[in-house]
Amino acid sequence: SDRVLYENNNKSLARKKSSLSTLFKFLYRNGQLKDDITGGFNPIKLPKPQPDAIKRLEIDEVATMLDVVENGNGLTDKEKDYWLKTKLRDKAILVLFITYGLRLNELRELNISSFNFSRGEFMIYRKRGKEVLMPINEACERVVKDYIDYERPKSSDIGEEDQDALFLSLQKKRMTSRSIRDLVKKYTSIAMKTSRDKGYSPHKLRATAATSLIETGFSIYDVQNLMDHDNVTTTQLYAAHRKNLKRDIVENFNWLDEDTPLGKKRND
């Protein structure tokens, strides 16, 4: 029946397979089965998330987030005390995330020596030990330099192990993944006007960078290269998320319709 077909989609099958695997492994460990037969189960391929499931910040939310880190708006008194000591660091972290779509570990592993400002580039340490030189734009160069020059602790105060680490905690150690994640959650939650626990992860800022680049007009293959996606189908998810963008642009790019911005300008 249709009901049976519906219930046996790949997600349902994966759940059922998991339950059976647990049962058979239990029986095997207890000597009730001679062989562990779960090794012969065929893998079940689960579908990639649908485009409408992609969560990211909208442009106005990015603007709000950057305003928060700039001015401290929306922070509690306790958060503001902390922010006064880390605002340049926090700003540099957020700007790098939304510009380059860095993975959490890629940002965490950045060193001062990763940056060559005279050549206008910096080194990213990708997955699987891959190193990639990336051009640094003016905004990113400015926020990173401001942090290094005006807020980062002096070398004499930093332990040998963390001398080269770019982003340091107040304890003068390389920031942990958790502290970076909490930082991003805090600022994004204020931007989205939600509770701190519902703030976004660094991966959502990666999604924000990808969709924003595609909206700006960069090709899927350019974005794939910048984001280091293994497969272009991953990048296409972000493009599909904004599938109506071209229609919106074209409808607004209308010289003859008096209700569009261009039409109004022409008739002024």
Where are these regions (language model features)?
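Conserved catalytic core of the tyrosine transesterase superfamily
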Residues: 1-268
